[in-house]
Structures are given as C-alpha cells and as structure tokens.
C-alpha cells in the first residue's frame, strides 16, 4: 500500500497517535506524518504510507491555512490555554487597535519558536528542556504570513484565518500579537484547514477510517505532487534514471526548460519519481517506482 491519506485529526491526539492508528489499520510498517499538529489542535494531517514516506519533505513544503482563536490578556508557558498561566492583564485595546496589530504581522517576518515545541537544539527537543524548567535562547526563523483574515472579535477572544509558510507556529504568532498590544495573548483553539494540496473539505475523520475504507481513501503519490510540473522520458532514459544515473544527453535536457524539480513518468504514464535538473544533467532525486 503506497500513497497518502488526508486525515482530519481530532483534538486530544498527538500526530504520532494518528500514525500509530493508521499503522494498525493499514498493517503497514512505513507510515509517517507530514507536519506536527499539537494535541490541542484539530485539522488536516496528511499521512504517508509505504513508498510515500520518501516524499514527506516535499509534501510538507506547501502553504498552510489555519483557523485560530486567540485569547487576549493571558500569558502561559506553552503559549496556549493548556499551559501554566504566568500572567493575567486587562485588555484595554480597541477593536481597531487589535485589527491593526494582527494585520501588521503579514509578510516575511522573523519568529521565535516556543520552548514547548519539537524543535531540537544539540539533539535535545525543546519541550524536553521546558519540562525540566529549563529555558534557552532560541534563534528566530524567517517565516512568511501570506494573508490574515479577521473572522470575529469578542474581546478577549479573537478568531482569525492565517495563510502561512511551513514552520510557522500559530502559538508564537498569538504570543507576539499579545506582546505588541501590551496585554499578552495565548492560542485558545486551532484548526488546520489545509496543508499544501490537502484540504479539510476532502479529508476523512480519523475515527471513520477502517480496514474496509482505507484503500478507497488513499491518494496516489503523484497526485499529491501536482504542484510540480511533469515530464515524460523514453525507455532508454528511463533505464538510466531509475538506476541513479545523471543524464546529460541533450535529447533529454532540451525537453526540460527549467532547473527545478519535476514529476517524472515513462511513456506508459508510470510514475517514476521526482527528478531535478542541474548544470551536470538530469537525475531522479526520489525514486518511487
């Protein structure tokens, strides 16, 4: 069984809980998720099975869309409502000031990840240090907030939709917005609406997945990579490429316009994998045949 499941994760489970359940249902050993969702969060969690686990990094590259609910006036150690409340402040900002502060985070920004995260420093996960009461300085990371839409404001609660790059922490975004307003804030609820090509409208709730319907819900690997252009290669080049040879023959190179990643098919429309063109030639970088 090779492909990707568009799972809708319920609140209360970790991403690895979902992986374990899919392993049990599919009876497959190779199963992996494509981007952690906190237990507090629900939403789209693409799960790769079999050979699809080879392309986890490529699936994770896509933009993410979240529906977030933020509570102003409270600060917690985890940046969400499940953590220890460290401070409570009065919210004095007007709705206009709140909107202005939120919208100022659009564009390319630097974000410091929360201590309670799976990021590693010197091989140790940050949340393992945080649980020991250790806080260390974290380097800021460049992220992109493509769009923010305010859904509702009922002070101290604010609901908004965020379209962002991978690696964005909505908990940190809420914390930073609260910091800018001077009252603090924490993430109260979160739903991932989409992740790359995967949307909640076409997802299957984890609790509905079973041995009978898993096959009909699995998506072919190449269909999940439709954001990459495709090329077809003839039999001669196919044999070279699947054996790891970097092909510099101009009869192939001239068919490939740009130095970027492509979906590669043979002439019978069999998906071979992902290939990349460089100055030295064209090569399969992820073989999936």
From Swiss-Prot:
Enzyme superclass (EC): isomerase
Disulfide bridges in this chain: none
UniProt-listed Enzyme Commission number(s): 5.4.99.25
InterPro entries: PsdUridine_synth_cat_dom_sf (IPR020103), PsdUridine_synth_N (IPR002501), tRNA_psdUridine_synth_TruB (IPR014780), TruB_C (IPR032819)
PANTHER family tied to this protein: PSEUDOURIDYLATE SYNTHASE TRUB1 (PTHR13767:SF2), TRNA-PSEUDOURIDINE SYNTHASE (PTHR13767)
NCBIfam families, alphabetized: TruB
Keywords of the record: Isomerase, tRNA processing
Protein name from the UniProt record: tRNA pseudouridine synthase B
Record flagged with keyword Endoplasmic reticulum: no
Biological process, per Gene Ontology: mRNA pseudouridine synthesis; tRNA pseudouridine synthesis
Catalytic activity: uridine(55) in tRNA = pseudouridine(55) in tRNA
Gene this chain is encoded by: truB
Role of this protein: Responsible for synthesis of pseudouridine from uracil-55 in the psi GC loop of transfer RNAs.
A GO molecular function held by the record: tRNA pseudouridine(55) synthase activity
Active-site residues per Swiss-Prot or TrEMBL entry: 38 (nucleophile)
Domain of life assignment: Bacteria
Family per record: Belongs to the pseudouridine synthase TruB family. Type 1 subfamily.
């Amino acid at each position: 069984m090779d492909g990707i499941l568009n799972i809708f994760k319920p609140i209360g489970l970790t991403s690895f809980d979902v992986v374990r359940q899919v392993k049990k249902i599919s009876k497959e050993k190779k199963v992996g998720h494509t981007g952690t969702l906190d237990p507090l969060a629900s939403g789209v969690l693409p799960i790769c099975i079999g050979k699809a686990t080879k392309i986890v990094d490529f699936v994770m590259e896509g933009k993410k869309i979240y529906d977030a609910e933020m509570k102003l006036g409270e600060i917690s150690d985890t940046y969400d409502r499940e953590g220890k409340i460290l401070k409570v402040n009065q919210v004095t900002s007007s709705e206009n000031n709140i909107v202005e502060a939120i919208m100022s985070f659009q564009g390319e920004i630097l974000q410091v990840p929360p201590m309670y995260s799976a990021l590693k420093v010197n091989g140790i996960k940050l949340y393992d240090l945080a649980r020991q009461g250790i806080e260390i300085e974290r380097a800021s990371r460049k992220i992109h907030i493509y769009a923010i839409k305010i859904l509702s404001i009922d002070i101290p609660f604010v609901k908004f939709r965020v379209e962002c790059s991978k690696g964005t922490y909505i908990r940190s975004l809420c914390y930073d917005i609260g910091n800018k307003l001077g009252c603090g804030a924490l993430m109260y609820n979160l739903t991932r609406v989409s992740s790359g090509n995967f949307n909640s409208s076409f997802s299957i709730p984890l609790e509905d997945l079973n041995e009978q319907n898993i096959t009909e819900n699995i998506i072919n690997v190449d269909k999940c990579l439709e954001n990459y252009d495709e090329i077809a290669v003839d039999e001669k080049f196919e044999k070279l490429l699947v054996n790891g040879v970097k092909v510099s023959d101009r009869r192939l190179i001239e068919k490939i316009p740009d130095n970027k990643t492509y979906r590669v098919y043979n002439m019978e429309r069999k998906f071979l994998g992902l290939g990349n063109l460089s100055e030295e030639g064209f090569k399969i970088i992820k073989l999936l045949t």
